Amino acid sequence: MLNPSLPAIADLEDSFLPQNLPPVIDAHVHLFPDKLFTAVWQWFDTYGWPIRHKLGSEEILSFLFDRGVSHIIGLQYAHKSGVSRELNRYMASLCTRHDRLTGMATVYPGEPDAENILIEGFDMGLKGVKLHAHVQCFDMRSQSMKAIYRVCSDHGRPLVIHAGREPKSPAYLCDPHRICQSAFVREVLRDYPDLRVCVPHLGADEFDDYARMLEQFDNLWLDTTMMLADYLPCDTVPKLSDLRPDRIMFGTDFPNLPYAWDREIKRLAEMSLPQTLLSKLLHENALEFFKIHLDPAANLG
């Protein structure tokens, strides 16, 4: 549960990634136009937590690349009908300037011409779709969502969907515990077996259900966003070594964080995980999920 009393953490941060790690893809970075970022930060200041690095999109990319991150997955979401095309054009323009950025399209479920909006985004080079149920307040079983599933599946594009119940806020216009249930995600995975789905935050707070679904469905991935930080009041966060190793991706939620940019990657580096598992978590699984085809001459590290 989010509340305005969640604190900033004054932890120290370094100017580069920890040593001896495989190449790092951050699979969960938010990129918005400045005006929308300002609105997002105002919301967090009021209802969430203090954000340490309030940076614009270009500054975010420079910040992370300069500190050793090899590749970034740029995420966005449309908070209302009518803004999706503009957001998709914005993300596509960032991708044309940064070859180490893979951008996701977005759409407001149920808005007019939603399917064509996504197809246009794919034609601009965007590699998948990001939706946020808490903000967009959609029913995952609705016809408008089924249309999105079909478009993504038909075009081989993955769907990153904040479908977990947490972190929720009373400021949302809908109740995430009502509209976000692991059973709903299970239906999507079953009905659209060719659709690759990533649920962020390890599926918080239905960790056990999502861990079981990882074993049952080859089209489900999870990301670690904020779950390694020991910040949110979530109980029983699973150990990464207990989860299906080829279906977990590292992500941070940068820049919308109340702590050091490298808090989670440091903790990951201290877990003494096998190098093969680290490689999967930090880049191999993201390359597979997002179907990122790197130039053979490019150096991921």
Language model feature labels by segment:
Residues 28, 91, 121, 129, ...:
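Conserved, mostly hydrophobic/aromatic
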Residues 3-7, 70-71, 79-168, 218:
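Active-site gating/metal-coordination segments in enzymes
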Residues 10-21, 61-62, 118-119, 144-155, ...:
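Short amphipathic alpha-helices and their capping/turn segments at secondary-structure boundaries
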Residues 24-27, 73-75, 104-105, 130, ...:
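Active-site neighborhood of phospho(di)ester-bond hydrolases with catalytic His/Asp-centered motifs
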Residues 24-34, 160-164, 199:
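Histidine-centered catalytic micro-motifs
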Residues 1-27, 37-38, 42-66, 70-71, ...:
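Mid-to-C-terminal alpha-helical segments outside catalytic/metal-binding sites
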Residues 2-6, 127-128, 141-249, 300:
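Catalytic pocket-lining loop regions of alpha/beta-barrel enzymes
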